[in-house]
């Protein structure tokens, strides 16, 4: 549902970029996980969030679009030449001119917490000085050297300083915060994209 800020109602869209031609695992969105495709599971988690007025899958692959339509989801076909998921997101955001906030949920996050979507959208509705926000969580010990876990270092205000798949050294004692694990969810003001 839309967020009301003062007298202004902000409309929120959740977009799930999904492409078939993954480098590490081609066809990943259509892979079955306990009887449902990956993209279906991600969509089902996203629609549990309370803040989005609309949830849309953005894809350049017809079979993914057909899968989404088959389970009753919304889908927008995009160009095939986008270098990143954010570029695909921006293409769809241009078509959603009535929406103020765009939440980007990665198409390979079947366990995304819907509350994270809501919290990121709320950050932008409550802080007009922010154009983009993302999420992070404590890094588990076994993830420190895992290249698939994106680490993020933040300053004392919680602002990201840098991201890395490599091990990030930090002092065990002192003021430095240990690295966090980046969660692949972003929220943007549509005008920022």
Task: Name each model feature, range by range.
Residues 112-193:
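Conserved core of the sugar-phosphate nucleotidyltransferase
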Residues 11-59:
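N-terminal glycine-rich phosphate-binding loop and ensuing alpha1 helix
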Residues 52, 98-99, 127-130:
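Short, high-confidence coil segments that cap the C-terminus of an alpha-helix
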């Amino acid at each position: 549902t839309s967020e009301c800020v003062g007298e202004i109602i902000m409309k929120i869209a959740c977009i799930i970029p999904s492409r078939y031609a993954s480098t590490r695992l081609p066809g990943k969105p259509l892979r079955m996980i306990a009887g449902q495709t990956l993209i279906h599971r991600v969509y089902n988690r996203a629609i549990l969030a309370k803040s989005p007025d609309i949830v849309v899958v953005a894809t350049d692959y017809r079979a993914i679009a057909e899968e989404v339509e088959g389970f009753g989801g919304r889908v927008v076909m995009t160009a095939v030449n986008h270098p990143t998921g954010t570029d695909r997101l921006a293409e769809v955001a241009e078509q959603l001119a009535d929406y103020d906030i765009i939440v980007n949920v990665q198409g390979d996050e079947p366990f995304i917490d819907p509350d994270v979507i809501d919290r990121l959208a709320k950050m932008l509705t409550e802080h007009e000085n922010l154009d983009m926000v993302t999420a992070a969580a404590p890094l588990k010990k076994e993830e420190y050297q895992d290249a698939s876990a994106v680490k993020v270092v933040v300053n004392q205000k919680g602002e990201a300083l840098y991201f890395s798949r490599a091990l990030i050294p930090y002092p065990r004692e002192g003021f430095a915060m240990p690295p966090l694990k980046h969660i692949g969810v972003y929220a943007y003001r549509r005008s920022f994209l």
